[in-house]
């Protein structure tokens, strides 16, 4: 059994080195090209999908669409879920990473970005960019919508969707594509690879590169590689 992850192509805020999180930004020109190249590469290597899962953020949805279009599979059903959203960066969202490091120190920013269980400063629910004011999440209970997350909380958000939707799809024989975000994919990788809380800090998933997992019947990783 195989599972393919792809982190969205470079976004406009990736290019500007800004914290993005749940803020909805578009792909950059480079990001569009990365997604198209990924789709072509998947086609060249014979990858076909029966179902695709993505987030409710534009950069991941667009990447998913482009990948499927460039691999002649735009007909493949897509399921969009907030549970695959990027980690919510709280008050850091929209801030320049370099300027934030100058203000708080490199080590503090590194911990905010990479630590498994350290939360960023939480965003006020009344902030104009709060997810509580976004109709994408209007169906969710207020106490479920995050104001800031670490990777641990992100995994707790993503895991129910893995167990309820993604894993059963794989086990039923479906060929699955997950087009999501750096941290939601890191959370899933931590779970399926059994990565420790410490080692996950060093895992980086590049934009726009298909990551293939070969899995056994228990969804244990036999092999992983980038195309």
From Swiss-Prot:
Recorded catalytic activity of this chain's protein: (2R)-2-phosphoglycerate = (2R)-3-phosphoglycerate
EC top class, as a word: isomerase
GO function terms (MF aspect): phosphoglycerate mutase activity
GO aspect biological process, one term: gluconeogenesis
Binding site for substrate: 7-14, 20-21, 59, 86-89, 97, 113-114, 182-183
Positions of disulphide bridges: none
Keyword Cytoplasm: no
Pathway: Carbohydrate degradation; glycolysis; pyruvate from D-glyceraldehyde 3-phosphate: step 3/5
Site annotation Transition state stabilizer: residues: 181
Cited PANTHER family: PHOSPHOGLYCERATE MUTASE
Entries under HAMAP family matching the protein: PGAM_GpmA
Record protein name field: 2,3-bisphosphoglycerate-dependent phosphoglycerate mutase
């Amino acid at each position: 059994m195989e599972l393919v992850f792809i982190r969205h192509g470079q976004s406009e805020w990736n290019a500007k080195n800004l914290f993005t999180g749940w803020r909805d930004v578009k792909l950059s020109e480079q990001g569009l090209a990365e997604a198209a190249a990924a789709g072509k590469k998947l086609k060249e290597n014979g990858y076909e999908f029966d179902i695709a899962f993505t987030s409710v953020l534009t950069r991941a949805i667009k990447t998913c669409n482009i990948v499927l279009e460039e691999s002649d599979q735009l007909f493949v059903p897509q399921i969009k879920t907030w549970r695959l959203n990027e980690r919510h960066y709280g008050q850091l969202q929209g801030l320049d990473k370099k300027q934030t490091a100058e203000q708080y120190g490199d080590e503090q920013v590194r911990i905010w970005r990479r630590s498994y269980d350290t939360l960023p400063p939480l965003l006020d629910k009344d902030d104009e960019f709060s997810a509580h004011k976004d109709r994408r999440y209007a169906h969710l209970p207020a106490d479920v919508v995050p104001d800031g997350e670490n990777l641990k909380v992100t995994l707790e958000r993503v895991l129910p969707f893995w167990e309820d939707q993604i894993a059963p799809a794989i086990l039923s024989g479906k060929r699955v594509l997950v087009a999501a975000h750096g941290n939601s994919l890191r959370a899933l990788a931590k779970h399926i690879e059994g990565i420790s809380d410490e080692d996950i800090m060093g895992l980086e998933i590049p934009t726009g590169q298909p990551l293939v997992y070969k899995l056994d019947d228990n969804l244990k990783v036999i092999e992983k590689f980038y195309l």
